[in-house]
Amino acid sequence: EPIPGFPEFGHIPFEGLHNTRDLGGMPAADGRRIAPAKLIRSGCLHKASEQDLARLVGDYDLAGVIDFRTQLERDKEPDPRELMEGVVFYDFPALSGETIGITHGAGVAQDLKTFASYNASPHELVRGMYPQILLDDAGRVAYTSFLEVLLEGDGGAYLWHCSEGKDRAGLG
């Protein structure tokens, strides 16, 4: 069900970026709302077009990008930092290693091996993922650092992402 004042759940259409959302208009504390064009979550920036990146930097006055992916994921599909002049990049991996169904670094074959070795049911595996992300040492450090960056921000917009813009970025 749509949230009043938050049309289309903040979806921003881009050419190469998927699942990009402006949190502006979302209800906040004391009846207030999040300011538009300040908090943006997205999937990986690797496939963004040059026009997408120019829009983020110019139209949104992008000050920083927070990347919740693992080092393996960042190495495999790096952010196009060289095309985003003036933007500060923060690498805050929210997971200490590969996590089946979330990370995209090891590949399908490794995911299947990991899944086969898991002793609990698939339902238990999925149910335990979000608490693991938030309560694991890596997650606590990543999300604490993320909030500190936002609180110390200079008024520009901040974008945070993982691979798909759902799990790790959705918790952000």
Where are these regions (language model features)?
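Cys-dependent protein tyrosine phosphatase-like superfamily
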Residues: 1-159, 172
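Ser/Thr-glycine-rich phosphate-binding loops at phosphate-binding pockets of nucleotides
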Residues: 163-169
